[in-house]
């Protein structure tokens, strides 16, 4: 990479001259502002500028560039608009800078497919402000539009504006708002021998922002005659067709990542993925793979599909198991052809960083009958070399997992291309957390606080708060490699989606974090937050914090009946020890909500046991302060403590 230092011309303009070889090709470049004192840098927004070599015989090219700040309407530069809603299917020829010409380039992503951008100004070469004679621009570099104007037809300063026209009728769709632009180039004898490029402009849209309708739906809710009892990726094509007929521009999906943990209906929750990269095998259209050579076995699966499709509700377990059985048989029949293909090998190599660990995870999960990797013996802690060796030693099973992901990827990419061709954008969903028994937690545990849980504080709809069970993000650790995990995740999602819904976006900045041994959300604290030091409470609020009294469950004999009713005496004798002065402490086996729920999970479900369990959970919530999990000896007030005892 070459770095050039620029020199100031005045308060607003900087310049640099550079000699380039005659055979130089197209390349990208950026501008950087660097603080000479501390080295801090400010970078431009968006994609790099592009240098397009001028036509042969051009000795000098002068670039009048602009620093690229985040533009007004920057979402319009996303693929949802540039590759879908406003995509240009048939492009004009490229405009090449040439001597004796001024090339003007402007970014305008929101010009509709049936429109064209034009330039109009106060000179005859620009149509003299008459839209009928405005000079149409090329969309070859869309969302950048460009036009060449003969320098001999220009006088400086020239005034001009950009406008959008209907392609066929020439009717004006919109003038850009604001004052006229000014084009000023110092005219000299050599001007006709050089190429001049004015770049970095942005169409000033103004007016009402773009509005569009869309629909949100889980993939599993889509149904068609070609299903196998549950919606799949190929059903999305029908959804896109419906969106087109109803004038909608977005189809939003729930998360589509693999959630297989137990091979039961408990895996149906789409926000508890075992991988943030792998797609869900449930959404594979198995008929797209082909048919089994054995007509009896193929008939068996055809009948199963008919039976499952006739059900009023999805039979999650049978549909998932049926697809798994079919793909196993089909892989045994034709898998080798796919595995040996160049396209398959390229897919595996391109995705190896997440795909190999995911495949090993799936095989180990099934062999150990649990996704809890702490139960996997020598594989409980992820080791790259061990995982690689395991993949090599179990190539058949690993390749089967690759095979499924390969076809899921092909089908989802096909659907996205289909949607783009129809002008419909696909919108994905980014869950707030990851599963603590996922490939991500196994492969990169340092990126997560696995000893905590994400949730939400109490409100009028959930007085005990919410506990989602996901580990929270270790942002400090993630920052060490420039958030590589997040970048890889977004890159993968961008292969299938044009926009994202971010689940619980506030939690990415400040999360409600709950201890792992808690069940209710009441015992959580915000992270990050500033906890109190005991001396701060004494000096500023005259409050003497006693951790044993204020940060431990406060249990007094006289209010046990409020928690346990007629079972108060039994609760005292079974679960508590006296601590003096009418105070009680919970026994070791019942001093956390996790221990209590695990104990009663093995007891009979009776109203008495429900009351005992609920009472114990409430007593454990009965604290005034919670110790900070990272700064021991510092404390947070328990939320809604005013309602406690």
Regions found by a protein language model. Give the residues of each.
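Aromatic-rich carbohydrate-binding modules that target alpha-glucans
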Residues: 1-25, 34-56, 108-156, 165-188, ...
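A short, polar/charged loop/turn motif at coil->beta-strand junctions and beta-hairpin connectors
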Residues: 10, 98, 113, 131, ...
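A short, amphipathic beta-strand motif
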Residues: 100-108
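Extracellular interaction modules
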Residues: 56-63, 68-69, 185-193
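Catalytic cores of glycan-processing enzymes that make or break glycosidic bonds
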Residues: 77-96, 103, 150, 184-645
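Residue-level signal for pocket-adjacent positions within structured domains
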Residues: 27, 47, 106, 132, ...
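Intrinsically disordered, low-complexity polar regions and short flexible loop motifs
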Residues: 63-81
